[in-house]
Regions:
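Two-component/phosphorelay signaling modules centered on CheY-like receiver
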Residues: 35-53
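Acidic, metal-coordinating helix/loop segments flanking the phosphotransfer/catalytic sites
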Residues: 54-72
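Acidic catalytic/metal-coordinating carboxylates
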Residues: 56-57, 83-87
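Receiver (REC) domain active-site loop signature in two-component systems and cognate sites
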Residues: 79
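Alpha4 helix (beta4-alpha4-beta5 surface) of REC/receiver domains from two-component response regulators
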Residues: 86, 107-122
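C-terminal output helix
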Residues: 110, 128-137
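The C-terminal output helix
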Residues: 138-147
Length: 147
């Protein structure tokens, strides 16, 4: 059995479920300049039946045709060119209110306060427990369904 199967079994036991919007499958977009982190999160989310896609930068995500299908954004704070809060602000300016989970390897109370004040759903310092991430993604997708 591989890693994906092990994750799928653990998550099924915890009761995580796939969230779907009526008549469409929202994408969980992961934006992280660390390819290994982005791919690991993508694998985790796919293992519970979510549609997920990793992007290496905010610019790549903004130019993606998947932007319109995104129901949840998991974004790293510390990235070159455009950090996670800047990406969130750019999306807001474009009228794209995407429920967002901000992750960071360099946690600070200031960034946490700014993120939550801006409207970010969850703030997770790396390394985080996969169940915490899944709870945040679940909350974000539930919020997206309300819109």
């Amino acid at each position: 059995m591989g890693l994906a199967n092990d994750i799928r079994i653990r998550n099924a036991a915890r009761g995580y479920r796939s969230c779907q919007m009526p008549n469409s499958r929202p994408i969980v977009a992961i934006v992280d300049d660390d390819e290994a982190v982005g791919n690991a999160i993508e694998l985790l989310l796919r293992s519970i039946g979510l549609v997920a896609q990793a992007f290496s930068s905010g610019d790549e995500f903004l130019l993606s045709p998947e932007l319109s299908r995104t129901g949840c954004l998991v974004v790293d704070f510390d990235m070159p060119k455009m950090n996670g809060l800047d990406l969130y602000a750019n999306l807001s300016r474009l009228g794209k209110e995407i429920p967002t989970v901000l992750i960071t390897a360099y946690p600070s109370d200031d960034i946490r306060a700014r993120a939550l004040q801006a409207g970010v759903i969850c703030y997770l310092p790396k390394p985080f427990d996969e169940s915490d991430l899944l709870d945040c993604v679940q909350t974000a997708l539930d919020r997206a369904k309300e819109k």
